[in-house]
Amino acid sequence: MARDVEAQLNYIESLISSVDSQIDTLNKAMIEVQSTIDLLSNGDLASSPEKLISIGSGLFAKGNITIDEDLIVPIGSGIYVAETKERSVERLKKNLEDIKASIQKLLDQRKTLVDQYNTVYATEATRNVK
């Protein structure tokens, strides 16, 4: 019976680890989305004397960025559309709320798993005391 309990505890631990990884990924995405919202919402980009544009592989080129015109936004399957800065900020704010909701669901799921782990562990500990 002890091996079954150990296997069950290991399985729950792996689920908790997976949830933690998903939460970490979503937290990083949330920071990136919030940074983009901040960048589009304030005038720092327009007033910055030097702008570097990533061209990949850690290389950057100096360039000019105009965010007063439409932004080009990916909508999936390699398709892009033009979108106003204001519309982009609205969409990003909605994305941010969706990410926060997903994080909350994962935190709830994690709590359930931790409770389940503690219950299994306590039950086994009680059996071993008897």
Curated annotation (Swiss-Prot):
Subunit details: Heterohexamer of two alpha and four beta subunits.
Record's keyword annotation contains Protease: no
Organism: Thermoplasma acidophilum (strain ATCC 25905 / DSM 1728 / JCM 9062 / NBRC 15155 / AMRC-C165)
Taxonomic superkingdom: Archaea
The protein's name in its UniProt record: Prefoldin subunit alpha
Family named by the database record: Belongs to the prefoldin subunit alpha family.
Function summary: Molecular chaperone capable of stabilizing a range of proteins. Seems to fulfill an ATP-independent, HSP70-like function in archaeal de novo protein folding.
Compartments it resides in: Cytoplasm
Alphabetic keyword roster: Chaperone, Cytoplasm
Molecular-function annotations in GO: unfolded protein binding
GO cellular component, one term: prefoldin complex
GO-annotated biological processes: protein folding
SUPFAM superfamilies reported for this sequence: Prefoldin (SSF46579)
